[in-house]
Each structure stands twice: as C-alpha cells, then as structure tokens.
Amino acid sequence: MLFSKKAKEIAIKKGVDFANETSELENHTFDIITMWHVLEHVPDLEKQIQELKRLLKPNGTLIVAVPNFKSYDANYYKEYWAAFDVPIHFWHFSRKAIKLLFEKENMKLEQVLPMKFDSFYVSLLSEKYKTGKMNFIKAFFIGLKSNWKAQKTSEYSSHIYILKNN
C-alpha cells in the first residue's frame, strides 16, 4: 500500500512513525485495525486478509465496513447500485462471505453492526448513476425503505464486521 508524499511529510513532522508498505511492519504490531469501505477496493483479497492477520496481535480486533449486496437498496437499483461500481469495487460481500473468508485465516466473526446512514448516501449516488441527477428526495425515501426492510431481514446497505484474530 503506497501513501501520498504530502501525507507522509505531514505525518513525519507530527512525529508519526511511518512505513511506506505494510510489509515493512513487524508481525503482530496492532491490537486493532480498521478498514472503512476499503476491502471491496483491494485487488488481491486473500493476500490482503493474510497481511491483516499477520499485522494483528493474537486476540487482536479487525473492524471491516463494507457494502452489502443483499440490501434492499442494492436490489432496488440493481446494476445502478453505486456499490456495484466496477472496476472501483472488485468485491461484493455478504455476511456469509465475510465469515468464510476470515475463517480461512483462523479469524472469528464476533459481531455484525448496521451502517444505517449508508443507505441514504448509496441511494443518492445510485440515483445519480441511474438518472444523471441528484434526486435527494427519492434517494432519502429509498434509503429509509432500505433501513425499514433491514429491521426484519438484517440486510442493511452496509455492515460493520468485528472480527477476532485467533
């Protein structure tokens, strides 16, 4: 993973230890790692998960937030759903997929939390993609309906997955 030169310069001036690549970091460095809408953009998924596992301390926590292709808004917008945006999104996840992917690396899915505001934002982006216009009102109601349906199905527009390194 490469970082911008400007971001690196600012970090160094503020006294932050900095590595250009995660491979430069020692094994079991972190108690917690967070990825907010990142994992779906990573080309080599298995390699990335192995690297996360390597970097986490034993019993460390990984927090991953990703879009959920089983949500109502994904089903409503179909090919216009913003999170299906290929090639920007390489991967599309469900709860089962996340569980299986990380179990292969001996990591346990501990908890799944909804990202309720994502349905509104993703619906707005999807409206723009579908119609070419930012239809705030329609996007709001589709986002609202997505969350309402998710109260019964637990399939929110995006989920936060909390995983433990075994």
Spans of features found by a protein language model:
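Short, Lys/Arg-enriched charge-dense amphipathic segments
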Residues: 2-5, 85-90, 132-143
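A near-ubiquitous, low-amplitude feature marking generic local secondary-structure context
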Residues: 35, 81-85, 142, 146
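Conserved SAM-binding loop
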Residues: 1-80, 90-104, 117, 157-165
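A C-terminal cap/extension of S-adenosyl-L-methionine-dependent methyltransferases
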Residues: 111-166
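Short glycine/proline- and charge-enriched loop/turn segments
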Residues: 77-86, 125-132
